[in-house]
Amino acid sequence: MGFKGAWNKRNRLIENPEEYYRLYKKLQRAYKLVREAIKRYGSFELLKGKTSLRDLEELLEERKQVLENLKKQLREAHKGKPKIEAEGDEQLKELIREVNRVQSEVRALEIITNRVRKYEEIYAQYKQMTEKKAYVDPKLWMRIRKMNEAGERKVVRTYSRATTIIPEFVGHTIAVHNGKTFIPVYITQDMVGHKLGEFAPTRTFKGHPDKTAKVVKKK
């Protein structure tokens, strides 16, 4: 089972692993902020299932327009009315409540839209850095790199089956998750260029049934 030449086909590594790792962490933080904003401010009635930047921007503009119209109505309703009369007007009170509600929606949408925009900007940088490159899990890469510098050889666990094995991994034992448990995989030179998941099968072959097994005859 020889893998000679496999690495030549995939020899497109990211030039700066440290910058890649920093950008990866930044992307994770931005994603977390988006999720928090949607959970805190984004009710289903408000977002209407829209989470893409373009949809959110359109929704924000729409709500801003509604707010402007309501404010205009409020100004018209206040015209020529004494303060005491205005305070007792139930229709006016309802209009004020509606203005406050839409104003809160606009603020919430602005927060969500700004965070989604920031996330998409970071994701664009991340995509540009990783496009047409061999995928290596950034956390695993940095951990192996630190172990190489310290001369350590501990077993490292990972869920990243899609990670491409790179020369820095040679000599390490990486426990790869197969969906049920971690399978220890000792990395050799021949494995370079392949995926970690190739060496931690998700299914095991238990053999064919014995020839002596009962065969049900067709009637």
UniProtKB/Swiss-Prot annotation:
List this protein's GO terms for biological process: ribosomal small subunit assembly; translation
Task: Name the segments for region: Small ribosomal subunit protein uS19.
Answer: 129-219
Q: Does the keyword RNA-binding apply?
A: yes
InterPro entries referenced in this protein's UniProt entry, alphabetically: Ribosomal_uS19, Ribosomal_uS19_bac-type, Ribosomal_uS19_CS, Ribosomal_uS19_SF
Q: Which PROSITE patterns match?
A: RIBOSOMAL_S19
Keyword annotations for this protein, in alphabetical order, are: Ribonucleoprotein, Ribosomal protein, RNA-binding, rRNA-binding
Keyword Ribonucleoprotein attributed? yes
Choose one Gene Ontology CC annotation of this protein and give it: cytoplasm
Q: Where is this region: Unknown?
A: 1-128
Q: Could you state a single Gene Ontology molecular function term?
A: structural constituent of ribosome
Q: Which residues form a coiled coil?
A: none
What family does the entry list? Belongs to the universal ribosomal protein uS19 family.
Q: What does this protein do?
A: Protein S19 forms a complex with S13 that binds strongly to the 16S ribosomal RNA.
Q: What is this protein called?
A: Small ribosomal subunit protein uS19
In the UniProt record, the gene name given for this protein reads rpsS
